[in-house]
Every structure is written in structure tokens, then in C-alpha cells.
Design a protein with these regions (language model features):
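A fold-level detector for beta-propeller and closely related beta-sheet-rich head/sensor domains
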Residues: 1-323
Length: 323
């Protein structure tokens, strides 16, 4: 395979795994099709794991309409930086970054199609279109390791305000966070494999156009004529898996205000890894909601984008920030 600078040089099929709570979660990728797979296996009575997975998240995403998915992004920092990842919801400057901000530019008519493709719209795929995603909508999971977010820990129970936070959140569901090189950090239901939510780091805005143009060794990407891109044409080498959200996420309980009325939240911290020079933070507290037995469904939503996204720190903030 031809491998480009900053690409992920890896075998055609590779995998990493996480074992937690009697389940095994295996993340795989296939560079020949530029796709990823996330499989869950149940433990058997003899302590070994079932041979067949309970669910596979990439295939489940194919069953979910792109419009139904809950995906957010951000433009810069600030209290209103978090927005829904839908073309009409993006600030004008973000739209400009998608269209002309990177090495590959697209027309004003095609820029919204980039966002639609990343969201999972498959209408542009085909022999005369963009890269086909036949078996999975999940991107390659290469260097990033899945992370399970559980209820708050009792280890800091004595800290001011934490007892109340613990009581409100001790029954919250576990969430499986997975970074993927489809430009997203995904949140999955650990029991069903359904996607609960996804986040597209705003630092990737000017590179999103690359995602539908990647080719696997099956060479199934053919540009829609010569009109999808303007200026530079497709330049991703065959068989290359380019990194986007390629770093490890983790969650921790954080005291966001001090004093007698201390407030605690659960934050997720993540990086782009080899995908770029950026660190981000999300508020994923998912406090119990009396209106639903599934708090992740009610809190992790596009309407809460401004509350979920907290901040990003990139090489624009500090030139010494590395990969």
C-alpha cells in the first residue's frame, strides 16, 4: 500500500480490546475499505467469551437514518461554541472552513454534502460517487482505545458537594466512548450497541472533506465527475487510513465550583492523537432525569450542544502543542 505522511501505517485488519463488567469490546479496522467495527462479546459460564458477538456497532449505524443521529461539533470556544453538526446549524465561519479552509476545497453546493456524508448520508455513495460504506458506517479505530464511563466513584465521597452528586448519578447507565477516524468520538450503549451521541471536534472542520475522498485498496471511491472538488483533486493514496479522532478519551469527576455549594460534573477529555494538535473537553455528566430511565438519551442531544461542549485547546493557542 502507498502510505502518506501522517497516515496510519497499519495492517489491513487490526484490533484492540477492552474487557469490563464481564463483557469484551473489540475495536477493529480494515484499511482496504477504510472502515471500522466495534464488537461486544458476552462472557460464558466457563470464563471464556462467546465466539459470536452480541452486537456490532458499525452495522447498527447503517440501520440508523443519518437525520436521526445526535451529533454535535464546536466552533472555537465560549458558552455558545457547541452546536449541532448540521449544515444549517453551523456558523458561517465553520462553513467556510469546510468549503475552502483545507488543502482540498469544494464548491458552495458540495460543502453541505460533505457534512451530510460525515453524518452518515449514503446517497452520494456508489460506483460513480464517493467512498461506499457497505458493511459499517463506523470509521477505522486505530490508535484510540475505547473507554467505559460508569457511575461516579465513591473514592472521593467525603469531598464537599460530592455526596449529592454521587447520589444523583449512582444509577446512571454506562456509556462506551470510542474515537474513530470518521472524524467523530462516538458514545454507544454498552448493552445494545446503539449509538447514543457523537462529537466532531471543531478543529477538524477544514479536513472533513478528506473523509469521503479516502480510498481503500478496493478502489471503490470515484469522484462524482470532476466537480465535487475544486482546485486540488483527490490526493489520498490508495490503502491509507488517515487519522482524525485518533487519541484516547477518558472521563473523570471534576469540581467546577468550590466553596460550600461545590458543584461536581463528569468531564470527558480527549485528543485527536495523530489526527491533529488539539485537546477537547465535554461535560458528559448525564445526571438522572425523572422523565426517562435512560438519562444518556435525554442529556446527550444536539439541543444540549452548548452545555456539553466545554472547551478546546489547539496549536493555535500554543504553538508548542504537539501530536
Amino acid at each position: 500500500d502507498s502510505l502518506a505522511k501522517d497516515s496510519n501505517a497499519a495492517p489491513a485488519i487490526s484490533s484492540a480490546q477492552l474487557i469490563a463488567g464481564g463483557d469484551k469490546y473489540v475495536a477493529e479496522f480494515d484499511s482496504t475499505t477504510v472502515t471500522g467495527f466495534l464488537k461486544a462479546y458476552k462472557v460464558k459460564d466457563d470464563g471464556d467469551f462467546e465466539a459470536s458477538p452480541t452486537w456490532e456497532a458499525g452495522a447498527k449505524l447503517l440501520e440508523t437514518g443519518s437525520n436521526a443521529r445526535k451529533i454535535i461539533t464546536n466552533y472555537g470556544n465560549g458558552t455558545s461554541a457547541g452546536v449541532a453538526f448540521r449544515w444549517d446549524s453551523l456558523p458561517a465561519d465553520y462553513q467556510t472552513q469546510v468549503q475552502t479552509g483545507g488543502a482540498i476545497t469544494v464548491s458552495a453546493a458540495n460543502a453541505p454534502k460533505v457534512v451530510a456524508y460525515v453524518r452518515g448520508d449514503q446517497s452520494l455513495e456508489g460506483l460513480n460517487g464517493l467512498r461506499q460504506r457497505d458493511g459499517s458506517l463506523l470509521g477505522p479505530i486505530v490508535n484510540g482505545t475505547p473507554w467505559i464511563q460508569g457511575p461516579p466513584s465513591a473514592e472521593i465521597y467525603g469531598s464537599t458537594g460530592y455526596a449529592d452528586f454521587f447520589a444523583k448519578n449512582k444509577a446512571r447507565q454506562r456509556v462506551l466512548w470510542v474515537p474513530a477516524n470518521d472524524g467523530m468520538l462516538h458514545a454507544f450503549n454498552v448493552t445494545t450497541g446503539e449509538e447514543l451521541f457523537a462529537y466532531v471536534p471543531g478543529a477538524l472542520a477544514n479536513r472533513l472533506v478528506e473523509i469521503p475522498l479516502q480510498r481503500g485498496t478496493t478502489a471503490r471511491t470515484k469522484l462524482a465527475g470532476a466537480n465535487f472538488t475544486s482546485g486540488a483533486t483527490e490526493n489520498q493514496p490508495t490503502g491509507t487510513v488517515w487519522p482524525y479522532v485518533d487519541g484516547n478519551p477518558f472521563t473523570a469527576d471534576v469540581k467546577v465550583t468550590s466553596g460550600a455549594d461545590s458543584v461536581w460534573r463528569t468531564y470527558l477529555l480527549g485528543t485527536l492523537g495523530r489526527g491533529g494538535k488539539a485537546v477537547y473537553a465535554l461535560d458528559v455528566s448525564m445526571s438522572a432525569d425523572p422523565l426517562t430511565t435512560d438519562p444518556a438519551v435525554s442529556y446527550l442531544s444536539e439541543s444540549n450542544a452548548a452545555s456539553i461542549f466545554k472547551w478546546q485547546f489547539t496549536s493555535d493557542d500554543d504553538a508548542d502543542l504537539g501530536y
